[in-house]
UniProtKB/Swiss-Prot annotation:
Disulfide bonds join C356-C554. GO terms for molecular function: enzyme regulator activity. Transmembrane segments: none annotated. This is Penicillin-binding protein activator LpoA. It comes from Haemophilus influenzae (strain ATCC 51907 / DSM 11121 / KW20 / Rd). Residues 1-25 form the signal peptide. One of its GO terms (biological process) is peptidoglycan biosynthetic process. A lipid is attached at C26 (N-palmitoyl cysteine). Regulator of peptidoglycan synthesis that is essential for the function of penicillin-binding protein 1A (PBP1a). GO terms for cellular component: periplasmic side of cell outer membrane. Interacts with PBP1a. Belongs to the LpoA family. Keywords: Cell outer membrane, Cell shape, Disulfide bond, Lipoprotein, Membrane, Palmitate, Peptidoglycan synthesis, Signal.
Protein backbone atom coordinates (compact mmCIF):
# COMPACT_ATOMS: atom_id res chain seq x y z
CA UNK A 1 0.00 0.00 0.00
CA UNK A 2 2.81 2.40 0.89
CA UNK A 3 4.47 1.64 -2.45
CA UNK A 4 1.24 2.57 -4.30
CA UNK A 5 0.94 5.81 -2.33
CA UNK A 6 4.55 6.69 -3.08
CA UNK A 7 3.85 6.01 -6.80
CA UNK A 8 0.86 8.35 -6.79
CA UNK A 9 2.90 11.07 -5.06
CA UNK A 10 5.67 10.63 -7.67
CA UNK A 11 3.14 11.01 -10.54
CA UNK A 12 1.80 14.21 -9.01
CA UNK A 13 5.30 15.64 -8.68
CA UNK A 14 6.18 14.54 -12.23
CA UNK A 15 3.02 15.94 -13.89
CA UNK A 16 4.04 19.66 -13.86
CA UNK A 17 7.41 18.73 -15.32
CA UNK A 18 5.81 16.66 -18.12
CA UNK A 19 3.25 19.40 -18.78
CA UNK A 20 5.92 22.10 -19.07
CA UNK A 21 7.90 19.88 -21.45
CA UNK A 22 4.81 19.31 -23.58
CA UNK A 23 4.04 23.01 -23.70
CA UNK A 24 7.64 23.75 -24.65
CA UNK A 25 7.29 21.28 -27.52
CA UNK A 26 4.06 22.96 -28.69
CA UNK A 27 5.73 26.34 -28.51
CA UNK A 28 8.51 25.07 -30.74
CA UNK A 29 5.92 23.86 -33.26
CA UNK A 30 3.45 26.72 -33.16
CA UNK A 31 5.52 29.60 -31.80
CA UNK A 32 4.84 32.30 -29.26
CA UNK A 33 1.69 34.38 -29.06
CA UNK A 34 3.36 37.02 -31.21
CA UNK A 35 4.18 34.46 -33.93
CA UNK A 36 0.44 33.83 -34.21
CA UNK A 37 0.15 37.30 -35.79
CA UNK A 38 1.43 35.62 -38.97
CA UNK A 39 -2.08 34.19 -39.27
CA UNK A 40 -3.49 37.72 -39.54
CA UNK A 41 -3.25 40.55 -42.07
CA UNK A 42 -0.07 42.64 -42.10
CA UNK A 43 -1.35 46.21 -42.21
CA UNK A 44 1.78 48.22 -41.41
CA UNK A 45 4.60 49.24 -43.76
CA UNK A 46 7.75 47.18 -44.28
CA UNK A 47 9.70 50.00 -42.61
CA UNK A 48 7.58 49.60 -39.46
CA UNK A 49 8.31 45.86 -39.21
CA UNK A 50 12.01 46.32 -39.95
CA UNK A 51 12.25 48.95 -37.20
CA UNK A 52 10.52 46.56 -34.78
CA UNK A 53 12.99 43.87 -35.80
CA UNK A 54 15.85 46.03 -34.54
CA UNK A 55 14.09 46.67 -31.23
CA UNK A 56 13.33 43.08 -30.16
CA UNK A 57 15.77 40.72 -28.44
CA UNK A 58 13.73 37.52 -28.84
CA UNK A 59 15.12 35.44 -31.72
CA UNK A 60 11.72 33.93 -32.55
CA UNK A 61 10.09 37.36 -32.67
CA UNK A 62 12.88 38.64 -34.91
CA UNK A 63 12.08 35.88 -37.42
CA UNK A 64 8.40 36.81 -37.27
CA UNK A 65 9.14 40.47 -37.95
CA UNK A 66 11.29 39.47 -40.93
CA UNK A 67 8.41 37.41 -42.33
CA UNK A 68 5.95 40.27 -41.85
CA UNK A 69 8.34 42.72 -43.52
CA UNK A 70 9.02 40.31 -46.40
CA UNK A 71 5.29 39.94 -46.98
CA UNK A 72 4.72 43.69 -47.12
CA UNK A 73 7.78 44.34 -49.31
CA UNK A 74 6.09 42.37 -52.10
CA UNK A 75 3.03 44.57 -51.77
CA UNK A 76 5.36 47.58 -52.06
CA UNK A 77 6.81 46.14 -55.32
CA UNK A 78 10.16 45.42 -53.65
CA UNK A 79 10.31 41.76 -54.59
CA UNK A 80 14.10 41.37 -54.54
CA UNK A 81 14.30 42.95 -51.09
CA UNK A 82 11.64 40.52 -49.89
CA UNK A 83 13.59 37.55 -51.24
CA UNK A 84 16.79 38.86 -49.64
CA UNK A 85 15.06 39.14 -46.27
CA UNK A 86 13.87 35.53 -46.50
CA UNK A 87 17.46 34.43 -47.07
CA UNK A 88 18.39 36.00 -43.71
CA UNK A 89 15.95 33.82 -41.77
CA UNK A 90 17.32 31.49 -39.13
CA UNK A 91 15.68 28.46 -37.52
CA UNK A 92 11.89 28.62 -37.79
CA UNK A 93 9.04 26.92 -35.99
CA UNK A 94 6.24 25.27 -37.97
CA UNK A 95 4.00 28.36 -38.00
CA UNK A 96 6.84 30.45 -39.39
CA UNK A 97 7.78 27.81 -41.98
CA UNK A 98 4.19 27.79 -43.22
CA UNK A 99 4.15 31.55 -43.66
CA UNK A 100 7.55 31.52 -45.36
CA UNK A 101 6.19 29.01 -47.88
CA UNK A 102 3.30 31.35 -48.69
CA UNK A 103 5.69 34.26 -49.20
CA UNK A 104 8.01 32.17 -51.39
CA UNK A 105 5.11 31.24 -53.66
CA UNK A 106 4.08 34.88 -53.89
CA UNK A 107 7.63 35.90 -54.85
CA UNK A 108 7.70 33.21 -57.56
CA UNK A 109 4.42 34.52 -58.97
CA UNK A 110 5.78 38.08 -58.93
CA UNK A 111 8.78 36.87 -60.94
CA UNK A 112 6.49 35.11 -63.45
CA UNK A 113 7.85 31.71 -62.33
CA UNK A 114 4.34 30.33 -62.56
CA UNK A 115 5.05 26.60 -62.46
CA UNK A 116 7.30 27.06 -59.44
CA UNK A 117 4.65 29.14 -57.66
CA UNK A 118 1.95 26.57 -58.39
CA UNK A 119 4.08 23.70 -57.06
CA UNK A 120 4.86 25.69 -53.92
CA UNK A 121 1.14 26.24 -53.34
CA UNK A 122 0.33 22.56 -53.97
CA UNK A 123 2.73 21.63 -51.17
CA UNK A 124 0.64 23.57 -48.65
CA UNK A 125 -2.21 22.07 -46.62
CA UNK A 126 -5.15 24.48 -46.93
CA UNK A 127 -6.62 23.12 -43.71
CA UNK A 128 -3.65 24.50 -41.78
CA UNK A 129 -4.11 28.03 -43.11
CA UNK A 130 -6.02 30.79 -41.33
CA UNK A 131 -8.59 32.81 -43.34
CA UNK A 132 -6.02 35.59 -43.85
CA UNK A 133 -3.45 33.07 -45.09
CA UNK A 134 -6.03 31.45 -47.37
CA UNK A 135 -6.72 34.85 -48.92
CA UNK A 136 -2.99 35.17 -49.68
CA UNK A 137 -2.94 31.62 -51.08
CA UNK A 138 -5.75 32.42 -53.53
CA UNK A 139 -4.25 35.81 -54.39
CA UNK A 140 -1.08 34.04 -55.52
CA UNK A 141 -3.18 31.60 -57.57
CA UNK A 142 -4.91 34.59 -59.18
CA UNK A 143 -1.59 36.22 -60.07
CA UNK A 144 -0.31 32.98 -61.62
CA UNK A 145 -3.47 32.72 -63.73
CA UNK A 146 -3.19 36.37 -64.75
CA UNK A 147 0.45 35.86 -65.74
CA UNK A 148 -0.79 33.07 -68.01
CA UNK A 149 -3.48 35.36 -69.46
CA UNK A 150 -6.17 33.04 -68.08
CA UNK A 151 -8.47 35.76 -66.82
CA UNK A 152 -11.39 33.48 -65.94
CA UNK A 153 -9.21 31.31 -63.69
CA UNK A 154 -7.81 34.48 -62.13
CA UNK A 155 -11.34 35.70 -61.41
CA UNK A 156 -12.29 32.34 -59.87
CA UNK A 157 -9.25 32.54 -57.58
CA UNK A 158 -10.18 36.06 -56.50
CA UNK A 159 -13.72 34.89 -55.74
CA UNK A 160 -12.23 32.32 -53.34
CA UNK A 161 -9.92 34.99 -51.97
CA UNK A 162 -12.90 37.24 -51.25
CA UNK A 163 -14.53 34.56 -49.09
CA UNK A 164 -11.58 34.75 -46.71
CA UNK A 165 -11.29 38.53 -46.39
CA UNK A 166 -12.60 40.37 -43.35
CA UNK A 167 -11.25 43.90 -43.88
CA UNK A 168 -13.56 46.18 -45.90
CA UNK A 169 -10.72 47.92 -47.76
CA UNK A 170 -9.21 44.59 -48.77
CA UNK A 171 -12.64 43.50 -49.98
CA UNK A 172 -12.91 46.67 -52.08
CA UNK A 173 -9.41 46.27 -53.52
CA UNK A 174 -10.17 42.68 -54.45
CA UNK A 175 -13.46 43.67 -56.09
CA UNK A 176 -11.68 46.36 -58.11
CA UNK A 177 -8.94 43.94 -59.21
CA UNK A 178 -11.50 41.31 -60.18
CA UNK A 179 -13.31 43.88 -62.29
CA UNK A 180 -10.03 44.99 -63.89
CA UNK A 181 -9.34 41.37 -64.88
CA UNK A 182 -12.72 41.09 -66.57
CA UNK A 183 -12.27 44.44 -68.33
CA UNK A 184 -8.93 43.30 -69.73
CA UNK A 185 -10.27 39.95 -70.94
CA UNK A 186 -11.05 39.32 -74.59
CA UNK A 187 -14.80 39.65 -75.25
CA UNK A 188 -14.78 36.29 -77.02
CA UNK A 189 -13.39 34.65 -73.88
CA UNK A 190 -16.07 36.35 -71.77
CA UNK A 191 -18.92 35.36 -74.08
CA UNK A 192 -17.80 31.72 -74.20
CA UNK A 193 -17.12 31.38 -70.47
CA UNK A 194 -19.36 29.20 -68.31
CA UNK A 195 -20.18 29.95 -64.70
CA UNK A 196 -19.72 26.22 -63.92
CA UNK A 197 -22.50 26.43 -61.36
CA UNK A 198 -20.57 29.10 -59.46
CA UNK A 199 -23.11 31.80 -58.57
CA UNK A 200 -20.44 34.41 -57.83
CA UNK A 201 -18.71 33.79 -61.16
CA UNK A 202 -22.08 33.89 -62.92
CA UNK A 203 -22.76 37.30 -61.41
CA UNK A 204 -19.39 38.66 -62.53
CA UNK A 205 -19.88 37.32 -66.08
CA UNK A 206 -23.33 38.89 -66.30
CA UNK A 207 -21.91 42.23 -65.12
CA UNK A 208 -19.06 42.34 -67.65
CA UNK A 209 -21.37 41.25 -70.48
CA UNK A 210 -23.75 44.10 -69.64
CA UNK A 211 -20.81 46.51 -69.65
CA UNK A 212 -19.51 45.25 -73.00
CA UNK A 213 -22.99 45.31 -74.58
CA UNK A 214 -23.75 48.92 -73.62
CA UNK A 215 -20.33 50.62 -73.51
CA UNK A 216 -21.30 52.80 -76.49
CA UNK A 217 -24.70 53.63 -74.93
CA UNK A 218 -23.93 55.03 -71.48
CA UNK A 219 -27.54 55.80 -70.53
CA UNK A 220 -28.56 52.20 -71.20
CA UNK A 221 -25.38 51.02 -69.47
CA UNK A 222 -26.32 52.93 -66.33
CA UNK A 223 -29.74 51.27 -66.35
CA UNK A 224 -28.19 47.83 -66.97
CA UNK A 225 -25.84 48.24 -64.00
CA UNK A 226 -28.72 49.15 -61.70
CA UNK A 227 -30.70 46.16 -62.98
CA UNK A 228 -27.71 43.93 -62.27
CA UNK A 229 -27.51 45.17 -58.66
CA UNK A 230 -31.20 44.38 -58.22
CA UNK A 231 -30.76 40.90 -59.74
CA UNK A 232 -27.71 40.04 -57.61
CA UNK A 233 -28.36 41.70 -54.22
CA UNK A 234 -26.15 39.23 -52.33
CA UNK A 235 -23.20 39.33 -54.72
CA UNK A 236 -19.94 40.70 -53.29
CA UNK A 237 -19.80 43.35 -56.03
CA UNK A 238 -23.35 44.49 -55.27
CA UNK A 239 -22.33 45.30 -51.71
CA UNK A 240 -19.04 46.93 -52.71
CA UNK A 241 -19.48 48.02 -56.31
CA UNK A 242 -16.33 48.36 -58.47
CA UNK A 243 -15.12 51.93 -57.95
CA UNK A 244 -14.65 52.41 -61.68
CA UNK A 245 -18.40 51.94 -62.22
CA UNK A 246 -19.76 54.03 -59.34
CA UNK A 247 -20.17 57.24 -61.35
CA UNK A 248 -22.16 55.34 -63.97
CA UNK A 249 -24.98 54.50 -61.59
CA UNK A 250 -26.18 58.12 -61.80
CA UNK A 251 -24.93 58.89 -65.31
CA UNK A 252 -26.35 61.93 -67.10
CA UNK A 253 -25.85 62.20 -70.85
CA UNK A 254 -23.90 65.24 -72.09
CA UNK A 255 -26.28 68.08 -72.89
CA UNK A 256 -24.49 71.18 -74.17
CA UNK A 257 -26.61 74.33 -74.46
CA UNK A 258 -23.87 76.82 -75.38
CA UNK A 259 -20.08 76.86 -75.50
CA UNK A 260 -17.39 79.39 -74.67
CA UNK A 261 -14.27 78.96 -76.85
CA UNK A 262 -11.13 80.45 -75.25
CA UNK A 263 -8.27 80.97 -77.73
CA UNK A 264 -5.50 83.48 -78.50
CA UNK A 265 -6.93 85.24 -81.56
CA UNK A 266 -4.53 88.18 -81.69
CA UNK A 267 -0.88 88.81 -80.92
CA UNK A 268 1.83 86.14 -80.99
CA UNK A 269 -0.51 83.15 -80.64
CA UNK A 270 -2.99 84.29 -83.27
CA UNK A 271 -2.12 81.71 -85.93
CA UNK A 272 -2.44 78.91 -83.37
CA UNK A 273 -5.81 80.10 -82.15
CA UNK A 274 -7.33 80.79 -85.56
CA UNK A 275 -6.22 77.40 -86.91
CA UNK A 276 -7.78 75.55 -83.96
CA UNK A 277 -10.91 77.68 -84.32
CA UNK A 278 -11.14 76.73 -87.99
CA UNK A 279 -11.05 73.01 -87.16
CA UNK A 280 -13.58 73.52 -84.34
CA UNK A 281 -16.00 75.41 -86.61
CA UNK A 282 -15.72 72.90 -89.46
CA UNK A 283 -16.47 70.04 -87.06
CA UNK A 284 -19.43 72.01 -85.66
CA UNK A 285 -20.89 72.25 -89.14
CA UNK A 286 -24.62 72.93 -89.04
CA UNK A 287 -25.03 72.37 -85.30
CA UNK A 288 -27.33 74.93 -83.69
CA UNK A 289 -25.36 75.01 -80.40
CA UNK A 290 -24.27 78.65 -79.91
CA UNK A 291 -20.51 79.24 -79.57
CA UNK A 292 -19.16 82.47 -78.09
CA UNK A 293 -15.48 83.08 -78.82
CA UNK A 294 -13.22 84.80 -76.28
CA UNK A 295 -9.77 86.16 -77.18
CA UNK A 296 -7.40 85.27 -74.33
CA UNK A 297 -4.83 87.72 -75.73
CA UNK A 298 -7.20 90.64 -75.12
CA UNK A 299 -8.69 89.73 -71.72
CA UNK A 300 -7.57 87.84 -68.62
CA UNK A 301 -8.86 84.33 -68.09
CA UNK A 302 -10.56 85.42 -64.86
CA UNK A 303 -12.48 88.14 -66.71
CA UNK A 304 -13.44 85.76 -69.52
CA UNK A 305 -14.78 83.16 -67.08
CA UNK A 306 -16.81 85.86 -65.31
CA UNK A 307 -18.20 87.05 -68.68
CA UNK A 308 -19.08 83.48 -69.65
CA UNK A 309 -20.93 82.90 -66.39
CA UNK A 310 -22.85 86.14 -66.83
CA UNK A 311 -23.88 84.98 -70.30
CA UNK A 312 -25.14 81.69 -68.86
CA UNK A 313 -22.36 79.62 -70.46
CA UNK A 314 -21.58 76.44 -68.52
CA UNK A 315 -19.26 74.75 -71.02
CA UNK A 316 -15.78 76.01 -71.90
CA UNK A 317 -13.24 74.81 -74.46
CA UNK A 318 -9.77 76.19 -73.70
CA UNK A 319 -7.64 77.93 -72.73
CA UNK A 320 -4.78 76.90 -75.02
CA UNK A 321 -1.73 78.59 -73.51
CA UNK A 322 -0.19 77.02 -70.41
CA UNK A 323 0.06 80.26 -68.44
CA UNK A 324 -3.69 80.76 -68.82
CA UNK A 325 -4.44 77.21 -67.75
CA UNK A 326 -2.29 77.71 -64.65
CA UNK A 327 -4.52 80.66 -63.71
CA UNK A 328 -7.46 78.24 -63.53
CA UNK A 329 -5.45 75.58 -61.71
CA UNK A 330 -4.38 78.12 -59.09
CA UNK A 331 -8.04 78.80 -58.25
CA UNK A 332 -10.32 75.97 -59.43
CA UNK A 333 -13.27 77.48 -57.56
CA UNK A 334 -13.71 79.98 -60.40
CA UNK A 335 -14.88 77.20 -62.77
CA UNK A 336 -17.15 75.49 -60.24
CA UNK A 337 -20.35 74.36 -61.95
CA UNK A 338 -18.75 74.49 -65.41
CA UNK A 339 -17.48 71.76 -67.74
CA UNK A 340 -14.01 72.70 -69.00
CA UNK A 341 -11.98 71.04 -71.76
CA UNK A 342 -8.53 72.62 -71.48
CA UNK A 343 -6.49 72.49 -74.69
CA UNK A 344 -3.21 71.87 -72.90
CA UNK A 345 -1.70 70.51 -69.70
CA UNK A 346 0.96 71.89 -67.36
CA UNK A 347 3.13 70.46 -64.56
CA UNK A 348 0.40 71.74 -62.21
CA UNK A 349 -2.33 69.69 -63.90
CA UNK A 350 -4.23 67.45 -61.50
CA UNK A 351 -7.61 65.83 -61.06
CA UNK A 352 -10.26 68.53 -60.71
CA UNK A 353 -13.98 67.75 -61.01
CA UNK A 354 -15.40 68.60 -64.45
CA UNK A 355 -12.00 69.59 -65.90
CA UNK A 356 -10.29 67.55 -68.63
CA UNK A 357 -6.96 68.12 -70.37
CA UNK A 358 -6.53 67.63 -74.11
CA UNK A 359 -3.52 68.45 -76.25
CA UNK A 360 -1.11 67.12 -78.84
CA UNK A 361 1.26 65.80 -76.23
CA UNK A 362 4.49 64.06 -77.32
CA UNK A 363 4.10 61.90 -74.21
CA UNK A 364 1.03 60.32 -75.85
CA UNK A 365 3.19 59.31 -78.79
CA UNK A 366 5.79 57.75 -76.50
CA UNK A 367 3.14 55.63 -74.78
CA UNK A 368 1.76 54.61 -78.18
CA UNK A 369 5.29 53.65 -79.27
CA UNK A 370 5.74 51.44 -76.20
CA UNK A 371 2.44 49.70 -76.98
CA UNK A 372 3.35 49.28 -80.65
CA UNK A 373 6.81 47.83 -79.97
CA UNK A 374 5.48 45.45 -77.33
CA UNK A 375 2.75 44.23 -79.71
CA UNK A 376 5.41 43.75 -82.39
CA UNK A 377 7.31 41.40 -80.08
CA UNK A 378 10.09 43.81 -79.09
CA UNK A 379 11.29 42.99 -75.57
CA UNK A 380 14.52 44.98 -75.22
CA UNK A 381 14.06 48.33 -76.98
CA UNK A 382 16.73 50.99 -77.22
CA UNK A 383 15.16 54.42 -76.79
CA UNK A 384 17.07 57.46 -78.08
CA UNK A 385 15.91 60.83 -76.73
CA UNK A 386 17.32 64.32 -77.26
CA UNK A 387 19.29 65.67 -74.31
CA UNK A 388 16.76 68.35 -73.33
CA UNK A 389 13.52 68.84 -71.42
CA UNK A 390 11.42 67.32 -74.22
CA UNK A 391 13.62 64.23 -74.26
CA UNK A 392 13.36 63.82 -70.48
CA UNK A 393 9.56 64.10 -70.52
CA UNK A 394 9.05 61.77 -73.47
CA UNK A 395 11.63 59.29 -72.19
CA UNK A 396 9.90 59.15 -68.81
CA UNK A 397 6.51 58.62 -70.46
CA UNK A 398 7.87 55.74 -72.56
CA UNK A 399 9.47 54.15 -69.51
CA UNK A 400 6.34 54.38 -67.36
CA UNK A 401 4.33 52.59 -70.04
CA UNK A 402 7.10 50.03 -70.63
CA UNK A 403 7.20 49.21 -66.91
CA UNK A 404 3.46 48.51 -67.06
CA UNK A 405 3.90 46.22 -70.06
CA UNK A 406 7.16 44.43 -69.26
CA UNK A 407 7.65 44.94 -65.53
CA UNK A 408 11.16 46.32 -66.18
CA UNK A 409 12.76 49.63 -67.15
CA UNK A 410 13.40 50.41 -70.80
CA UNK A 411 16.93 51.27 -71.95
CA UNK A 412 16.56 55.06 -72.29
CA UNK A 413 19.58 56.93 -73.66
CA UNK A 414 19.99 60.65 -74.36
CA UNK A 415 21.90 61.99 -77.36
CA UNK A 416 23.56 65.32 -78.09
CA UNK A 417 24.44 64.38 -81.67
CA UNK A 418 22.74 61.86 -84.00
CA UNK A 419 26.03 59.93 -84.18
CA UNK A 420 25.64 59.09 -80.47
CA UNK A 421 23.15 56.35 -81.34
CA UNK A 422 25.97 54.25 -82.81
CA UNK A 423 27.58 54.05 -79.36
CA UNK A 424 24.23 53.19 -77.75
CA UNK A 425 23.69 50.33 -80.20
CA UNK A 426 27.25 49.01 -79.94
CA UNK A 427 26.96 48.86 -76.15
CA UNK A 428 23.78 46.75 -76.42
CA UNK A 429 24.27 45.15 -79.83
CA UNK A 430 23.63 41.57 -78.80
CA UNK A 431 20.29 42.37 -77.18
CA UNK A 432 18.89 45.28 -79.17
CA UNK A 433 16.53 44.47 -82.03
CA UNK A 434 14.66 47.77 -82.24
CA UNK A 435 15.20 51.50 -81.73
CA UNK A 436 12.65 54.18 -80.88
CA UNK A 437 13.90 57.69 -81.62
CA UNK A 438 12.50 61.15 -81.06
CA UNK A 439 14.32 63.21 -83.67
CA UNK A 440 13.83 65.73 -86.46
CA UNK A 441 13.74 64.43 -90.07
CA UNK A 442 17.36 65.54 -90.57
CA UNK A 443 18.51 63.91 -87.33
CA UNK A 444 16.68 60.68 -88.07
CA UNK A 445 18.12 60.52 -91.60
CA UNK A 446 21.59 60.88 -90.12
CA UNK A 447 20.90 58.21 -87.48
CA UNK A 448 19.60 55.78 -90.06
CA UNK A 449 22.64 56.35 -92.24
CA UNK A 450 24.95 55.36 -89.38
CA UNK A 451 22.84 52.40 -88.26
CA UNK A 452 22.43 50.89 -91.73
CA UNK A 453 26.16 50.20 -91.80
CA UNK A 454 26.34 48.79 -88.26
CA UNK A 455 23.04 46.92 -87.73
CA UNK A 456 21.19 46.75 -91.05
CA UNK A 457 18.38 44.62 -89.59
CA UNK A 458 17.60 46.97 -86.70
CA UNK A 459 13.90 47.90 -86.66
CA UNK A 460 13.49 51.68 -86.34
CA UNK A 461 10.45 53.39 -84.84
CA UNK A 462 10.10 57.18 -84.70
CA UNK A 463 7.79 59.89 -83.43
CA UNK A 464 5.81 62.31 -85.58
CA UNK A 465 8.68 64.80 -85.35
CA UNK A 466 10.44 62.69 -87.98
CA UNK A 467 7.43 62.70 -90.28
CA UNK A 468 7.34 66.45 -90.84
CA UNK A 469 8.47 65.85 -94.41
CA UNK A 470 5.79 63.23 -94.99
CA UNK A 471 3.27 65.77 -96.25
CA UNK A 472 5.45 66.92 -99.13
CA UNK A 473 7.06 65.12 -102.05
CA UNK A 474 10.59 64.83 -100.70
CA UNK A 475 11.22 61.54 -102.51
CA UNK A 476 14.89 61.35 -101.50
CA UNK A 477 13.99 61.52 -97.81
CA UNK A 478 11.19 58.95 -98.20
CA UNK A 479 13.52 56.57 -100.04
CA UNK A 480 16.21 56.95 -97.39
CA UNK A 481 13.69 56.19 -94.62
CA UNK A 482 12.59 52.90 -96.20
CA UNK A 483 11.43 50.49 -93.48
CA UNK A 484 11.13 53.12 -90.73
CA UNK A 485 7.81 53.16 -88.86
CA UNK A 486 6.49 56.36 -87.30
CA UNK A 487 3.41 57.48 -85.40
CA UNK A 488 1.17 60.34 -86.34
CA UNK A 489 -2.43 61.48 -86.25
CA UNK A 490 -4.89 59.43 -88.33
CA UNK A 491 -5.94 62.59 -90.19
CA UNK A 492 -2.89 62.06 -92.42
CA UNK A 493 -4.02 58.54 -93.26
CA UNK A 494 -6.21 59.56 -96.20
CA UNK A 495 -4.40 62.30 -98.10
CA UNK A 496 -6.97 62.11 -100.89
CA UNK A 497 -9.96 63.04 -98.73
CA UNK A 498 -11.69 66.37 -99.58
CA UNK A 499 -11.11 67.59 -96.00
CA UNK A 500 -7.39 66.87 -96.21
CA UNK A 501 -7.04 68.44 -99.65
CA UNK A 502 -8.91 71.57 -98.56
CA UNK A 503 -6.76 71.99 -95.46
CA UNK A 504 -3.49 71.28 -97.26
CA UNK A 505 -4.37 74.05 -99.69
CA UNK A 506 -5.40 76.59 -97.02
CA UNK A 507 -2.30 75.96 -94.87
CA UNK A 508 0.13 75.53 -97.73
CA UNK A 509 0.73 71.99 -96.48
CA UNK A 510 2.19 73.34 -93.22
CA UNK A 511 2.39 70.22 -91.09
CA UNK A 512 2.00 71.75 -87.61
CA UNK A 513 -0.96 73.88 -88.65
CA UNK A 514 -2.73 70.85 -90.09
CA UNK A 515 -2.29 69.07 -86.77
CA UNK A 516 -3.73 72.06 -84.87
CA UNK A 517 -6.72 72.08 -87.22
CA UNK A 518 -7.32 68.39 -86.42
CA UNK A 519 -7.01 69.21 -82.72
CA UNK A 520 -9.71 71.87 -83.04
CA UNK A 521 -12.02 69.41 -84.78
CA UNK A 522 -11.51 66.85 -82.03
CA UNK A 523 -12.15 69.48 -79.35
CA UNK A 524 -15.69 69.80 -80.74
CA UNK A 525 -16.07 66.02 -80.67
CA UNK A 526 -14.81 65.74 -77.09
CA UNK A 527 -16.87 68.54 -75.57
CA UNK A 528 -20.04 67.00 -76.98
CA UNK A 529 -19.19 63.67 -75.33
CA UNK A 530 -17.82 65.22 -72.14
CA UNK A 531 -19.78 63.23 -69.55
CA UNK A 532 -19.27 59.99 -71.44
CA UNK A 533 -15.53 60.65 -71.61
CA UNK A 534 -15.24 61.45 -67.89
CA UNK A 535 -17.59 58.88 -66.42
CA UNK A 536 -17.56 55.81 -68.66
CA UNK A 537 -14.41 53.72 -68.12
CA UNK A 538 -13.02 52.52 -71.42
CA UNK A 539 -15.11 54.95 -73.48
CA UNK A 540 -13.31 55.71 -76.75
CA UNK A 541 -13.85 58.19 -79.57
CA UNK A 542 -12.38 57.99 -83.05
CA UNK A 543 -10.97 61.44 -83.82
CA UNK A 544 -8.69 63.09 -86.35
CA UNK A 545 -5.82 63.15 -83.82
CA UNK A 546 -6.19 59.53 -82.65
CA UNK A 547 -8.41 57.13 -80.77
CA UNK A 548 -9.34 59.27 -77.78
CA UNK A 549 -9.98 58.14 -74.21
CA UNK A 550 -9.51 59.62 -70.73
CA UNK A 551 -7.51 58.37 -67.75
CA UNK A 552 -8.54 58.68 -64.11
CA UNK A 553 -7.40 62.34 -63.97
CA UNK A 554 -9.28 63.06 -67.21
CA UNK A 555 -6.14 63.51 -69.27
CA UNK A 556 -7.28 62.76 -72.82
CA UNK A 557 -5.01 60.06 -74.22
CA UNK A 558 -4.47 59.48 -77.94
CA UNK A 559 -3.79 56.09 -79.48
CA UNK A 560 -1.83 57.02 -82.58
CA UNK A 561 -1.90 55.68 -86.13
CA UNK A 562 1.32 54.06 -87.33
CA UNK A 563 2.81 54.49 -90.79
CA UNK A 564 5.80 53.02 -92.60
CA UNK A 565 8.02 54.20 -95.42
CA UNK A 566 7.77 51.42 -98.01
CA UNK A 567 9.39 51.51 -101.45
CA UNK A 568 8.97 55.24 -101.93
CA UNK A 569 5.49 55.43 -100.40
CA UNK A 570 4.00 56.05 -96.95
CA UNK A 571 1.51 53.37 -95.91
CA UNK A 572 -0.50 52.79 -92.71
CA UNK A 573 0.48 49.71 -90.69
CA UNK A 574 -1.21 47.80 -87.88
CA UNK A 575 -0.92 49.20 -84.36
Amino acid sequence: MSILLQGERFKKRLMPILLSMALAGCSNLLGSNFTQTLQKDANASSEFYINKLGQTQELEDQQTYKLLAARVLIRENKVEQSAALLRELGELNDAQKLDRALIEARISAAKNANEVAQNQLRALDLNKLSPSQKSRYYETLAIVAENRKDMIEAVKARIEMDKNLTDVQRHQDNIDKTWALLRSANTGVINNASDEGNAALGGWLTLIKAYNDYIRQPVQLSQALQSWKNAYPNHAAATLFPKELLTLLNFQQTNVSQIGLLLPLSGDGQILGTTIQSGFNDAKGNSTIPVQVFDTSMNSVQDIIAQAKQAGIKTLVGPLLKQNLDVILADPAQIQGMDVLALNATPNSRAIPQLCYYGLSPEDEAESAANKMWNDGVRNPLVAMPQNDLGQRVGNAFNVRWQQLAGTDANIRYYNLPADVTYFVQENNSNTTALYAVASPTELAEMKGYLTNIVPNLAIYASSRASASATNTNTDFIAQMNGVQFSDIPFFKDTNSPQYQKLAKSTGGEYQLMRLYAMGADAWLLINQFNELRQVPGYRLSGLTGILSADTNCNVERDMTWYQYQDGAIVPVAN
